[in-house]
Regions:
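Conserved alpha/beta catalytic core and glycan-binding cleft of carbohydrate-active enzymes
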Residues: 1-63, 106, 117, 124
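C-terminal beta-strand-rich structural cap/linker in extracellular carbohydrate-active enzymes
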Residues: 142-159
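A residue-level signal for beta-strand positions that form part of recognition/binding surfaces
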Residues: 8-9, 99, 111, 145, ...
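Carbohydrate-binding surface patches
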Residues: 59-60, 66, 93-127
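Solvent-exposed beta-hairpin/edge-strand motifs
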Residues: 127-138
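Aromatic- and carboxylate-lined catalytic core of secreted/periplasmic carbohydrate-active enzymes
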Residues: 41-96
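A residue-level signal for conserved active-site and pocket-lining positions in enzyme catalytic cores
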Residues: 15, 76, 151
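Active-site/binding-pocket entry motifs
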Residues: 17-18, 131, 154
Length: 159
């Protein structure tokens, strides 16, 4: 239930989560780098605005431990800007697996967002023809099956 003309703020961490909850851990420390990246893909590619808490992109800038993710966030945000404008509606799809799926669509566009939230390679069966527009991680399309490596994601053009 969205308010017309307003965008949702999507985040894995903020000043509250690193001071009051999760034993003051950031997403990369709490979940591990690859799991956190998959969660950021999911949140970044659905409707709304992705909020990256200071230090999540480069922990060293705040004297914290963790992998520098500036290139990952650059690619994630570039994909959102190019393929998933906030003018598109969102429909969440039931997959019966560890693959998160949603359709982002408008009058002339239908895009499928897939993110593998597991540590195993996972297939997703398409219900319509599609082509991969961009992927973060190893993603292959063969016939009507998209295979996603652990914690990877893709945006597909349907039709």
């Amino acid at each position: 239930s969205s308010v017309s003309g307003k965008l949702k703020l999507r985040f894995l961490g903020n000043h509250d989560t690193v001071t009051w909850t999760f034993d003051a851990q950031r997403a990369q420390t709490l979940y591990g780098t690859e799991k956190a990246k998959a969660l950021w893909m999911m949140l970044g590619w659905i409707d709304g605005v992705l909020y990256i808490y200071q230090g999540d992109e480069d922990p060293a800038a705040y004297h914290l431990e963790g992998e520098n993710l500036e290139a990952f966030f650059t690619d994630l945000i570039a994909a959102k800007r190019e393929y998933l404008p906030n003018t598109l509606d969102t429909a969440y799809l039931q997959t019966g697996s560890a693959v998160f799926a949603c359709r982002r669509f408008g009058e002339q566009t239908s895009r499928l967002v897939l993110v593998n939230l597991s540590d195993t390679e996972t297939p997703y069966t398409l219900t319509a023809s599609a082509s991969v527009l961009t992927a973060l991680g190893n993603v292959t399309l063969a016939g009507n099956t998209v295979t996603l490596s652990p914690y990877s994601g893709a945006i597909l053009q349907e039709g």
